[in-house]
């Protein structure tokens, strides 16, 4: 898909499809008003006749509009003018995509980016439009022998901005929007890939692929023998029951003006399949446990977006690849594991494996002397119960870092909600036989999981994103969401801007 921006007059657009907005009730946007004057009241006559009310998402396709050089004019309902939110704006853009896709038009000139969205600028309108278009056009058919038949997709979208002075911001939005939507698509592709293909070795090959593609990326892959030498016993215990060995992939992106600048480290839980191990999960929906590597997928997608944006930062992405399977050699409830930092952990449930993989990974990344560390993981069903499928759960030992992430989440419309940490939750992790238990009971399960991880992050500023509710969708819309690539990308953009 080719995207571009310009500042032009609506009446001069010679294109396959010209898109303008109509507010509720039957109120023309500025661009639609200009077309109405050019067509001598043709559009307003249709509205008075009741052909379009202007409710958000309604569409009306017009052909041969008098005096208008465009082949087609698509009117898109935008709801009430003063109540247009980011969510509604994206839905409007996606309705545009659906309508245009049915016409066979190859090019679209879109004036919806001139709409007033609450608290947003031309930059955000253009960037959100690109992300919404790519989201709408995304499909994953790699393993279908008969590909679904689709009409020719349009290949070019030209966004119009109302003021020439906004063109520079709009061009920047193009760059960021394309990079972030590419990163989201990469994350989705990896997460949607079946677990008999996407195993820890597959994740490692993807990480190597980034190094082959970008000169400022270097990838190191650590195998189980190296992990054993490092004392990553908790990580390895989870992997013991699987025929597929674990791999820890370290993707180093260096583009900071100061090559010695401390890196930002992103850690992703990469359980390419989680059966629960000996504490086996119910069979219902177990197929969705291929998504237990959503954290690693989002780190991979973010590193792709970062490389495309060429941000002047040093960033390290870590994919903690592993598989949790039942087997005669699998770890058991009652086992006591010695972690890489020396703390011992009593295993009370083998399905609380992500924190065991992450605790050793969080210790491992100390060697990079990071500016900060953010881990993301499909860690707990408890977070889904608490926050549903709309907000990722955020926990942090740093108020500054937490606020930066919450700000980025709001900016990117990739929402997160902060949950507490504290000594009272540490009490729930006490064990009679080890330093820690790997679960803290039913109450506050998402928080006690984050509290567990905090024991391994004492040497740097740290935040944890529990994406169990946001990394994928179930039911008829089953599939990966690519979250929180947008949030993380915005966080990195902000870091680059504030240096």
Curated annotation (Swiss-Prot):
GO terms assigned for molecular function: manganese ion binding; metalloaminopeptidase activity
Keyword RNA-binding: no
Active site: 281, 355
Broad class of the protein's primary localization: cytoplasm
Cofactor remark: Binds 2 manganese ions per subunit.
Binding site for Mn(2+) 2: 269, 274, 292, 353
Gene Ontology biological-process entries: proteolysis
One GO CC term on file: cytoplasm
Keywords recorded for this protein, A-Z: Aminopeptidase, Cytoplasm, Hydrolase, Manganese, Metal-binding, Protease
Binding-site residues for Mn(2+) 1, renumbered to this chain: 274, 351, 353
Location in or out of the cell: Cytoplasm
Recorded catalytic activity of this chain's protein: Release of an N-terminal amino acid, Xaa-|-Yaa-, in which Xaa is preferably Leu, but may be other amino acids including Pro although not Arg or Lys, and Yaa may be Pro. Amino acid amides and methyl esters are also readily hydrolyzed, but rates on arylamides are exceedingly low; Release of an N-terminal amino acid, preferentially leucine, but not glutamic or aspartic acids
EC annotation from Swiss-Prot or TrEMBL: 3.4.11.1, 3.4.11.10
Enzyme type, top EC level: hydrolase
A Pfam family of this chain: Peptidase_M17_N
Co-factor(s): Mn(2+)
Record family assignment: Belongs to the peptidase M17 family.
Entry function: Presumably involved in the processing and regular turnover of intracellular proteins. Catalyzes the removal of unsubstituted N-terminal amino acids from various peptides.
HAMAP family per UniProt: Cytosol_peptidase_M17 (MF_00181)
PANTHER family: CYTOSOL AMINOPEPTIDASE, LEUCINE AMINOPEPTIDASE-RELATED
Protein name: Probable cytosol aminopeptidase
Species per Swiss-Prot/TrEMBL record: Actinobacillus pleuropneumoniae serotype 5b (strain L20)
Gene field: pepA
């Amino acid at each position: 898909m080719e995207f571009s921006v310009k500042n032009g007059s609506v009446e001069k657009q010679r294109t396959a499809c010209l898109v303008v907005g109509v507010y509720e009730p039957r109120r023309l946007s500025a661009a639609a008003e200009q077309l109405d004057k050019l067509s001598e009241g043709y559009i307003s006559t249709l509205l008075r006749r009741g052909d379009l009310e202007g409710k958000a998402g309604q569409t009306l396709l017009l052909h041969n509009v008098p005096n208008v050089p465009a082949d087609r004019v698509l009117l898109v309902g935008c709801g009430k003018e003063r109540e247009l939110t980011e969510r509604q704006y994206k839905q409007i853009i996606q309705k545009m995509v659906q309508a245009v896709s049915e016409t066979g038009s190859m090019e679209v000139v879109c004036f919806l980016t001139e709409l007033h969205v609450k608290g947003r600028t031309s930059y955000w309108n253009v960037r959100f439009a690109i992300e919404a278009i790519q989201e709408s056009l995304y499909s994953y058919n790699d393993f279908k022998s008969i590909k679904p038949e689709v009409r020719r997709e349009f290949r070019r979208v030209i966004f119009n901005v109302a003021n020439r002075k906004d063109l520079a911001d709009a061009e920047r939005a193009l760059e960021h929007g394309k990079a972030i939507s590419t990163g989201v698509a990469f994350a989705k592709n990896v997460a949607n890939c079946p677990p008999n293909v996407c195993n820890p070795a597959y994740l490692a090959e993807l990480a190597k692929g980034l190094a082959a593609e970008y000169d400022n990326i270097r990838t190191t892959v650590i195998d189980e023998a190296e992990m054993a030498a490092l004392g990553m016993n908790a990580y390895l215990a989870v992997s013991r029951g699987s025929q597929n060995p674990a791999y820890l992939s370290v993707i180093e992106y260096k583009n900071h003006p100061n090559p010695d600048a401390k890196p930002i480290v992103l850690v992703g839980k990469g359980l390419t399949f989680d059966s629960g191990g000996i504490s086996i999960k119910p069979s219902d929906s177990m197929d969705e446990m291929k998504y237990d590597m959503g954290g690693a997928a989002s780190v991979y997608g973010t590193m792709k977006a970062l490389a495309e944006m060429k941000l002047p930062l040093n960033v390290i992405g870590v994919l903690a690849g592993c598989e949790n399977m039942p087997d005669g050699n699998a770890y058991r409830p009652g086992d006591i594991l010695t972690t890489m930092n020396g703390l011992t952990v009593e295993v009370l449930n083998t399905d609380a494996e992500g924190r065991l993989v992450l605790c050793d990974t969080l210790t491992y990344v100390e060697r990079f002397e990071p500016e900060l560390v953010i881990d993301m993981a499909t860690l707990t069903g408890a977070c889904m119960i608490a926050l549903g499928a709309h907000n990722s759960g955020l926990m942090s030992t740093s108020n500054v870092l937490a606020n930066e992430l919450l700000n980025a989440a709001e900016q990117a419309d990739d929402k997160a909600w902060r949950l507490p940490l504290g000594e009272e939750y540490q009490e729930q992790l006490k064990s009679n036989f080890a330093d820690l238990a790997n679960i803290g009971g039913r109450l506050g399960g998402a928080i006690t999981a984050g509290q567990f991880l905090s024991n391994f992050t004492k040497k740097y500023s740290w935040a944890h994103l529990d994406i169990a509710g946001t990394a994928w969708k179930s039911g008829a819309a089953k599939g990966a969401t690519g979250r929180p690539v947008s949030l993380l990308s915005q966080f990195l953009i902000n870091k680059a801007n504030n240096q």
